[in-house]
């Protein structure tokens, strides 16, 4: 069969945010293992408020990635750039993007022209009409299957991680995103 080329994005993290990534792993591990198999962790030695980790914890009904996206979208004044392989937003995320575009924010969403999940492609296309009517630019990436999950708002807020802008990633799955508030990074 034919092989699909995949385009992805990654970050290499150092410093206090590494602690937060480790903590999110240990919370998941410890929830599913007995006392003698628990992972220990200790608080970080320092803090860096510019770089944080948003890690969903489904058993606790904690979904900070979605809240981080909503906060950034609602604060946007100039530009929102979203890159995701599967774009199936819930109503609140969709409305926040539509509202941003209607108030003059340049909203651009890049998805693969053809992903590795045709049903997700069909579901994604169902949002395009409303988005185009509101003035949102939809970019279909053709060079490969884009698997990157990144966003940048106003050249200052950025996120890179495992969460798609879809209902599963933002409201059900274990996911982790690095959130960076820094113009040089954005």
Name these PLM-found stretches.
Residues 2-3, 7-186:
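Charged, low-complexity intrinsically disordered terminal segments
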């Amino acid at each position: 069969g034919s092989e699909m080329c995949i385009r992805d994005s990654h970050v290499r993290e150092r410093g206090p945010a590494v602690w937060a990534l480790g903590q999110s792993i240990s919370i998941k591990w410890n929830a599913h293992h007995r006392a003698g198999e628990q992972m220990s962790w200790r608080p970080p030695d320092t803090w860096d408020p510019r770089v944080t980790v948003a890690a969903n914890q489904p058993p606790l009904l904690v979904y900070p990635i979605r809240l981080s996206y909503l906060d950034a979208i609602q604060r946007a004044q100039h530009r929102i750039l979203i890159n995701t392989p599967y774009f199936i937003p819930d109503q609140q995320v969709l409305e926040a993007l539509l509202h941003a575009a209607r108030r003059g924010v340049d909203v651009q969403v890049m998805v693969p022209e053809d992903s590795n999940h045709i049903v997700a492609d069909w579901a994604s296309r169902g949002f395009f009409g409303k988005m185009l009517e509101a003035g949102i630019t939809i970019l279909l990436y053709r060079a490969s299957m884009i698997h990157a999950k990144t966003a940048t708002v106003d050249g200052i807020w950025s996120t890179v991680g495992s969460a798609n802008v879809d209902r599963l990633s933002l409201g059900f799955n274990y996911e982790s995103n690095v959130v960076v508030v820094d113009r040089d990074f954005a």
